[in-house]
């Protein structure tokens, strides 16, 4: 086999550029296996240099069913790469492996992909090929017994890949169409309303303190008497909690009602929201 044919074969096998493949063939003395290893080492070197850059594009990959559903964020630097066939193929396969490993990133990274390589090695190769920083972000699996899981994808890139994804877990023994419709609508509501927590008492205390400080700063120079300022502050904080807790948010499909009102109207005694997660690329 001529060196030109070896370079062509190496390019097909690794996706690396002509110049890199040509140099690898020369360095390896024409040994294809050694050439692949040389490119892999160089790929790791290139990848490490890219890890200091920002990766605010990418996709959210969702996989699973009502019994078990998983979500994982795969970030890159540009939307162009996020839509690249190799990136999309990697993300789709990764989503299935993530569900199999219940979002345990340590196990996921060691899992074998269809190419026979581990996820972490495949990621390094993809970084070298794409020329961008690519990272795995947030990951979560819902699989609580007795629960039903739902999801909603917004701005779909392809199939189960999107720019925004929501997974929602409902606890109920009821398997009616009403429950399924509510699960889907609730996921859509969460996508649009971006609640901080299920209920006001579960909102992060640091976030509440930050909001309290902003309100205090706003009222500091208002000239209002202290007792009036305190009442205004309390009102603003109560409104903040109400608007950011899922159960007390205005229902997107019928804003005069709250989410908790819709649950009551369904009249399903054991129905409750277990958990939810909303991930949006760039946030």
Curated annotation (Swiss-Prot):
Keywords: Cytoplasm, Elongation factor, Protein biosynthesis. It is found in: Cytoplasm. PROSITE patterns: EF_TS_2. GO terms for molecular function: translation elongation factor activity. One of its GO terms (cellular component) is cytoplasm. Residues 78-81 are annotated as: Involved in Mg(2+) ion dislocation from EF-Tu. Coiled coil: none annotated. Associates with the EF-Tu.GDP complex and induces the exchange of GDP to GTP. It remains bound to the aminoacyl-tRNA.EF-Tu.GTP complex up to the GTP hydrolysis stage on the ribosome. Belongs to the EF-Ts family. This is Elongation factor Ts.
